[in-house]
A protein has these predicted regions:
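Structured-RNA-binding interfaces characteristic of tRNA pseudouridine synthases
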Residues: 1-211, 215-303
């Protein structure tokens, strides 16, 4: 029977989906786990061959097997054999010969930008950091020119082996998500008494008695109205999500679109220049290729 898997993974530590001469890949880990589980050599075939460092919530893969295990049960047993950064979210039986790569589909990618004055180490694996105060309104206007059926040669890595660079983007959205203010020092001052001053001062007093403070610090003492002044942040902490849906994409197309829109956001490219960039069919006209860390394949719809 033929089985299709819905696969999610953190691509940070992998050399992409497809098996490579050197470096660990998602496909390799799936093959190893399935071969061990089913007792026969298994080779999966993926729908989207994501690049090194790119993540997925919903990539698809198919394989053929003679196992008697019900297809819908394979995911449970398989996850026991996979690394923690790869998970199969569903498994199901599909018709022999079916492959999502050759079916009519719409894929959705999200590119995450952490826009702040300083990087956040907890977001480092899944978003791209920039301290430029991005103009989201300008980015949205620029994105509107990219929707539709176009020749996206300007948004494709030079040397890509494809018959045509014409593709269709069905939808593109740009959303802002404010970062939880509870995790930030706000623009106002922070008072020690606002963070359980009694407990805090008790801990400080203990440290003073144990000799962790200088003589000058001990003589100065600690007051419950001590105030730490936090300078105002230059930009608002936020996550900007570029969401792109289409029937197919060129090599690095979404990352180049994201890089171009960030150039628009910081004022290096004017939104009205986008039609000319498309018509120019010249990779040098578009923005840089955004880093892989911010890109996630989030949805795969079979029509």
């Amino acid at each position: 029977m033929r089985v299709m898997l819905q696969v999610a993974y953190d691509g940070t530590d992998y050399c992409g989906w497809q098996i490579q001469p050197s470096g660990v890949t998602i496909e390799e880990k799936l093959n190893e786990a399935l071969t061990e589980l089913l007792g026969e050599e298994i080779k999966v075939s993926g729908a989207s061959r994501t690049d090194s460092g790119v993540h997925a919530l919903c990539n698809l893969a198919v394989f053929d097997t003679d196992t008697k295990i019900p297809a819908e049960k394979i995911s449970y047993a398989l996850n026991q054999r996979l690394p923690r950064d790869i998970r199969v979210r569903a498994s199901l039986k599909v018709p022999d010969g079916f492959h999502p790569r050759f079916a009519k589909t719409v894929k959705t990618y999200e590119y995450s930008i952490y826009n702040s004055q300083f990087p956040d180490p907890l977001r480092d694996r899944y978003s791209f950091f920039t301290y430029y105060d991005l103009d989201v309104a300008a980015m949205k206007k620029a994105a509107s020119f990219l929707v539709g059926k176009h020749d996206y040669a300007s948004f494709c890595t030079v040397g890509s082996q494809v018959e045509s660079t014409v593709r269709t983007i069905t939808d593109m959205e740009i959303d802002e998500r404010p970062v939880d203010e509870a995790l930030l020092c706000a623009n106002a001052g922070v008072f020690l008494k606002d963070v359980n001053a009694g407990s805090f001062l008790k801990d400080v007093t203990t440290c003073m008695n144990e000799g962790d403070f200088s003589k000058e610090q001990k003589n100065a003492g600690i007051r419950d109205d001590m105030k730490i002044e936090i300078p105002p942040r230059r930009i608002k902490d936020r996550e900007i999500i570029i969401r792109v849906s289409g029937t197919g994409f060129l090599y690095n197309m979404v990352r180049i679109i994201a890089g171009t829109l960030m150039e628009v956001g910081r004022g290096a490219i004017v939104p009205d220049e986008i039609p000319g960039i498309i018509e120019g069919r010249d990779r040098n006209l578009a923005g840089p290729t955004a880093p892989a860390c911010g890109l996630t394949l989030v949805k795969y719809v079979i029509l």
